[in-house]
Amino acid sequence: MKRPSGRAADQLRSIRITRNYTKHAEGSVLVEFGDTKVICTASIETGVPRFLKGQGQGWLTAEYGMLPRATGERNQREAARGKQGGRTLEIQRLIGRSLRAALDMSKLGENTLYIDCDVIQADGGTRTASITGAMVAVIDALKVLKKRGGLKGGDPVKQMIAAVSVGIYQGEPVLDLDYLEDSAAETDLNVVMTDAGGFIEVQGTAEGAPFHADELNAMLALAHDGVRQLFELQRAALAD
């Protein structure tokens, strides 16, 4: 089996995490997984949704979108269509769920973190890149909130999270699929993990033949190794 990119089966694409990418957001990151590029911002607003008012805890919610020409052919903006597509809703819910699992909401105070992930170029793995980049943006935003005196109960970050795709391509498990691989893969998994090795979410679909337990275990092992490398890159970015 030869991957279109020439990478080894267990090799990530070139990953870059650039902090403070935009001027106004409390936290902002440009995250690049190969040719996939996503701007992730974390904005802080005082107040929480109605169902949380008076409970002394915060909230995090996420939105996801793609520029019209992030892909090979132009797609109409969802705003122009008047509604978000099912894929968009699924991905932004995944991003929100994953990031909430990283935080202790009781330490946020009654503040809301708004996460915006905007894909400026897509070449596979946009949701996993979004989660990985947004985690760094969240940490930067929380530093700003702390300086403002908005954190009363210590650091809300319980654990780091990152995400990566794995799949079965030409009969073999591979890590971090690009678009060419993703579109031809027999199986595609998106895996969100903590830096302690726990799983937050595993999304998997067999596009062709069903996959078996040994293949699933092989893919999860690849994901574990890939996410470990992503945590190292996140920490290196935060140390700059």
UniProtKB/Swiss-Prot annotation:
Enzyme Commission designation: 2.7.7.56
Catalytic activity: tRNA(n+1) + phosphate = tRNA(n) + a ribonucleoside 5'-diphosphate
GO molecular function: 3'-5'-RNA exonuclease activity; tRNA binding; tRNA nucleotidyltransferase activity
Transferase recorded as keyword: yes
Keyword annotations: Nucleotidyltransferase, RNA-binding, rRNA processing, Transferase, tRNA processing, tRNA-binding
Amino acids binding phosphate: R87, G125, T126, R127
Metal-binding is among the record's keywords: no
A family per Pfam: RNase_PH_C
InterPro entries: ExoRNase_PH_dom1 (IPR001247), ExoRNase_PH_dom2 (IPR015847), ExoRNase_PH_dom2_sf (IPR036345), PNPase/RNase_PH_dom_sf (IPR027408), Ribosomal_Su5_D2-typ_SF (IPR020568), RNase_PH (IPR050080), RNase_PH_bac-type (IPR002381), RNase_PH_CS (IPR018336)
Cross-referenced Gene3D superfamilies: GHMP Kinase, N-terminal domain (3.30.230.70)
GO biological process terms on file: rRNA catabolic process; rRNA processing; tRNA processing
Function of the protein: Phosphorolytic 3'-5' exoribonuclease that plays an important role in tRNA 3'-end maturation. Removes nucleotide residues following the 3'-CCA terminus of tRNAs; can also add nucleotides to the ends of RNA molecules by using nucleoside diphosphates as substrates, but this may not be physiologically important. Probably plays a role in initiation of 16S rRNA degradation (leading to ribosome degradation) during starvation.
Family according to the record: Belongs to the RNase PH family.
Quaternary structure note: Homohexameric ring arranged as a trimer of dimers.
Protein name in the entry: Ribonuclease PH
Species assigned in the record: Stutzerimonas stutzeri (strain A1501)
Gene: rph
